[in-house]
């Protein structure tokens, strides 16, 4: 997969993107044939235990982007630019985006609308592919006053439409639409030539993205309305750990087949 192939999928084939934060998850995503792996700054609240994405640092993101690349050497990997990694200056944005490409990312994703058009253009001119992200942008949650659906008012609709056109004009190869009302997401998708990838933005985007932990049911306390659980791995893992605990306590594990003696054959698996 590459940028040009993704752009050609618009209106012809739905694009599938999932987040992944480590090598084993990335390998599974690659083996499943997922089009894009996003190493999201959602790493913060899904893996690192933060309340939101604001505390996530470049150093944390770089470690996880590199891990994902090692786990999925053939995948198209997009790295999220974390809070304050691109906002302070164009120079800072180029430097940090370049660091992501050096550890294996194919592109970066930037949250924000028309006000970040120049940042997108400079990155693209520097040889760094950029995916835009408008609608609900979690890094700006304090400005929005919470996680609220976007595009409900005419002012919001006009801003989103302007932003999508500006990001396209500045060279973005795709745009994530997060929690945008379906009608506006459809209007944006039909009004630009680059793909839109929706999360909580209805049925008419050119693709869809979900967070790894949401679609696999790894967090029993959080289930966004717009997401769908395709598995309940929390319960599966919980039961496995409980069974392991029970067998150890009762002396069932390890059994004869799991131990080495002076007559044992073969090596170890770890």
Curated annotation (Swiss-Prot):
Pfam families reported for this sequence: Pantoate_transf (PF02548)
Coiled-coil segments on the chain, per record: none
Localization (cell): Cytoplasm
Sites where the protein binds 3-methyl-2-oxobutanoate: 41-42, 80, 109
A cellular component annotation (GO) from this entry: cytoplasm
Assigned EC number: 2.1.2.11
Keyword Metal-binding: yes
Active site as annotated: 178 (proton acceptor)
The entry's keywords: Cytoplasm, Magnesium, Metal-binding, Pantothenate biosynthesis, Transferase
Main location: cytoplasm
Cofactor binding annotation: Binds 1 Mg(2+) ion per subunit.
Pathway: Cofactor biosynthesis; (R)-pantothenate biosynthesis; (R)-pantoate from 3-methyl-2-oxobutanoate: step 1/2
Cofactor(s) this protein cannot do without: Mg(2+)
UniProt binding sites for Mg(2+): 41, 80, 111
GO biological process entries: pantothenate biosynthetic process
HAMAP family: PanB
Subunit comment: Homodecamer; pentamer of dimers.
Function (record text): Catalyzes the reversible reaction in which hydroxymethyl group from 5,10-methylenetetrahydrofolate is transferred onto alpha-ketoisovalerate to form ketopantoate.
Family that this chain belongs to: Belongs to the PanB family.
Protein name, per record: 3-methyl-2-oxobutanoate hydroxymethyltransferase
Biological classification of the source: Bacteria, Thermotogati, Thermotogota, Thermotogae, Thermotogales
